Amino acid sequence: MKINELDVVRLKDGREGAVVHIYPGGKAYCVEIADNYGQTLDLVGAEEKDTAAVI
């Protein structure tokens, strides 16, 4: 699966967020998890194996 910056992804743990940074090599990326008001709740590092879908 190809993941790009600003894609919205669903992680295998059920959280959804926007990819805000892809690390060199493209194997890991940073996902911003936000609430309904757009406030950032968490920034998590993830890999393709942690991703259920690009939505």
Go through each PLM region and give its residues.
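Basic/aromatic-rich interaction segments and small domains that mediate binding to polyanionic partners
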Residues: 2-55
